[in-house]
């Protein structure tokens, strides 16, 4: 049995190495809303000087980072299909500057817009799309609403956490309880992480769907019925406000798509190829 497991590990490693051989990655720093953002630019192998290709901006979720498996698999598969990507850490996350306690959805939206401007300046950048998981999905949807279809050619949302506004109104975020009408300056979460009171104050009246509905381009929403963090009905509502969208409800899939990750990556990349290539 151990030999079988070892063979599986070796095969998985070889697959990752082969993916890496088909793409080029470069770590960069982008000026964000409260400091520098750590980012990775990944381009398809064989992209020649002067040639353009589509670029997808990949946004992680609350307490996540750009190096998550979902983000990595998506970027790798995009590169295999001739599409570049830029994945980055929001302020207060991963390797990016700024305290986690200073992070809010509005300043993550500002981060996303600054990353968009960076991507637009890349010499190889063609059409630009956005994808985001959880809170990153909310940020992607609102950023696309602000920038419009002329600038964002398609959007993919994975378990978009639009519940965050209702959580703030109820006074409960990620299991932490507080007075929503008078939140403390810091709310303890996990380990040493503390959520800032400004996060709650801004989330309380955040116009998530109102801003997102301004986006008129093609969109894809993927959500699981087993999501215990964000009920899939929040994903369904995006489908209702976006006429040019498709909705994939995955039976029993959890918030992180732990058992459905490859299926989610395949759906995501197939949709992006269809709308960008």
Predicted regions mapped to residue ranges:
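Short beta-strand element of the alpha/beta-hydrolase
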Residues: 51-61
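Conserved alpha/beta-hydrolase
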Residues: 75-97
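Alpha/beta-hydrolase fold nucleophile elbow
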Residues: 123-134
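Catalytic nucleophile-loop/oxyanion-hole region of alpha/beta-hydrolase
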Residues: 66, 93-125
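N-terminal cap/lid segment of alpha/beta-hydrolase-fold proteins
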Residues: 23-50
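The serine-hydrolase catalytic nucleophile loop
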Residues: 63-75, 90
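The alpha/beta-hydrolase serine catalytic core
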Residues: 34-37, 138, 145, 150-237, ...
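Glycine-rich nucleophile elbow surrounding the catalytic serine of serine-hydrolase chemistry
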Residues: 132-142
């Amino acid at each position: 049995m151990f030999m079988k497991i070892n063979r599986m590990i070796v095969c998985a490693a070889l697959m990752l190495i082969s993916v890496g051989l088909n793409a080029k990655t470069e770590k960069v720093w982008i000026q964000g809303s409260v400091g520098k953002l750590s980012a990775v630019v990944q381009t398809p192998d064989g992209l020649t000087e002067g040639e353009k290709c589509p670029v997808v901006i990949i946004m992680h979720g609350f307490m996540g980072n750009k190096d998550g498996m979902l983000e990595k698999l998506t970027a790798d598969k995009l590169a295999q299909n001739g599409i570049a990507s830029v994945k980055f850490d929001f302020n207060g996350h991963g390797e990016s500057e700024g305290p986690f306690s200073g992070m809010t959805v509005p300043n993550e939206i500002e981060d996303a817009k600054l990353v968009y401007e960076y991507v637009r300046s890349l010499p190889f950048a063609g059409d630009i799309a956005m994808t985001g998981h959880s809170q990153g999905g909310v940020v992607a949807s609102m950023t696309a609403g602000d920038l419009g279809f002329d600038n964002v050619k398609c959007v993919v949302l994975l378990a978009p956490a639009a519940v965050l506004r209702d959580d703030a109104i109820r006074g409960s975020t990620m299991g932490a309880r507080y007075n929503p009408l008078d939140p403390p300056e810091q709310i303890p979460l996990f380990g040493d992480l503390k959520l800032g009171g400004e996060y709650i104050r801004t989330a309380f009246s955040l116009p998530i769907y109102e801003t997102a509905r301004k986006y008129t381009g093609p969109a894809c929403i993927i959500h699981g019925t087993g999501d215990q963090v964000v009920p899939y009905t929040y994903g369904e509502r995006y489908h209702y406000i976006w006429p040019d969208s498709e909705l994939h409800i995955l039976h029993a899939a959890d918030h992180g798509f732990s058992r459905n990750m490859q299926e989610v990556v395949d759906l995501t990349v197939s949709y992006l190829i269809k709308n960008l290539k």
